[in-house]
UniProtKB/Swiss-Prot annotation:
Topological relation to the membrane, as annotated: Multi-pass membrane protein
Keywords: Membrane, Transmembrane, Transmembrane helix
Domain Nudix hydrolase per the UniProt entry, residue ranges: 27-185
Source species: Schizosaccharomyces pombe (strain 972 / ATCC 24843) (Fission yeast)
Localisation: Membrane
Stated name of the protein: Uncharacterized protein C14C4.10c
UniProt xrefs under InterPro entries: CoAse, NUDIX_hydrolase-like_dom_sf, NUDIX_hydrolase_dom
Transmembrane segments: 123-143, 227-247, 303-323
GO terms for cellular component: endoplasmic reticulum; Golgi apparatus; membrane
First-listed, main subcellular location of the protein, grouped into a coarse class: membrane
Pfam family, one: NUDIX
Length: 329
């Protein structure tokens, strides 16, 4: 299957798109900037230069690795420039401007940056969608060249311009293990979380394996510590490729639903979700696709845990009966 990245058409569609606003959103808000640029400087003397980008020009996107902090929920993760909206910010896009300037030193109000459009808002949740944390807005910008970066070390460990099309390569699509006990509240005792993890195992989530530039600080990390593109940032690119790469979006090539590490739970979940998965495959992905799919999927995971627990109890009881009958005979 040929994966096409139609940048010009995608940017045009995105510029005409009216992003959906989330009703009853949590009060805490944050914004990120998806910044696309080119190694070969474009002719920005023409005000309509984004419509005249040569087909041979290779688009890059700016990715950052967050600094390592114990207090940060997303410590060390791959991300996009951005952060929480402050009281002085008059709008969500102003938050993206301010945070980008602070974190990587790019002034999006200068640098000949062109604002393309916004993706759908998404509510970031925890505990398998139970608790809303914040509302995230994503804004897409395109620059005619790659400006120099000035990293805020307290927030950003490293940054790299990454080929946008490489995020679609089949060999870069992978799965990573995420501790299933993260579905529990933080107030639960540690031994409860440990028992839950032993019983349930990990959840296998979609992710993208990245190739880091040798000049990047991330490259200096041991291979097992180098991060994947996953989670929230991954979901933003899934939405972006709905516009830029319809072929990959149609077949959900860069994201799919998570599954359990343990085979018995995986089988039970597959049984309960077979019609749900079929419905998803019959519709074309739309805005906020990852979180929409997960919000409908998490109830099936909870049902799987209940049925799986009862099934395992039944097996233990059956084993007990067999052993008892053996010793009696």
């Amino acid at each position: 299957m040929e994966l096409e990245l139609d940048l010009l058409t995608g940017l045009q569609l995105l510029s005409e798109y009216c992003p959906r606003v989330t009703p009853n959103a949590p009060p805490r808000r944050a914004s990120v900037a998806v910044i696309i640029a080119f190694k070969e400087s474009q002719d920005f003397s023409n005000p309509k230069w984004p419509q005249c980008i040569p087909i041979t020009s290779v688009p890059y996107v700016l990715l950052i690795q967050r600094s390592f902090r114990d207090t940060d929920r997303w410590s060390g993760h791959m991300a996009l420039p951005g952060g929480t909206r402050s009281l002085t910010d008059k709008s969500d896009i102003q938050t993206a401007h301010r945070e980008t300037l602070e974190e990587v030193g790019i002034d999006l109000r200068k640098e000949h940056a062109h604002f393309v459009g916004a993706l759908d808002e998404r509510v970031i949740t925890s505990n398998w969608g139970q608790f809303p944390l914040l509302l995230l807005s994503s804004f897409v910008f395109i620059l005619p060249y790659m400006p120099s970066l000035r990293l805020q070390e307290s927030e950003v460990f490293s940054a790299q311009w990454y080929p946008l099309a490489d995020l679609l390569l089949p060999e870069c699509q992978t799965r990573i293990q995420i501790d299933s006990s993260r579905a529990l509240k933080k107030t639960y005792p540690r031994f409860i979380k440990t028992l839950f993890h032993l019983a349930v195992g990990n959840l296998m989530y979609s992710a993208i394996r990245l190739e880091f530039d040798p000049s990047s600080a991330t490259y200096s990390l041991p291979p097992y510590q180098r991060p994947f593109l996953r989670g929230i940032t991954h979901s933003i690119f899934v939405d972006l490729f709905i516009f830029l790469s319809p072929s990959s979006a149609r077949h959900c090539l860069c994201w799919s639903l998570p599954y359990f590490q343990h085979y018995d739970l995986r089988f039970i979940a597959s049984f309960f979700t077979q019609f749900y998965r079929l419905r998803l495959h019959q519709v074309y992905p739309r805005g906020n696709w990852v979180f929409t799919c997960l919000n409908g999927y998490y109830p099936y995971l909870k049902l799987t845990l209940l049925v799986g627990f009862l099934f395992r109890l039944f097996l233990v009881y059956l084993l007990f009966l067999i052993i008892s009958a053996y010793y009696k005979s």
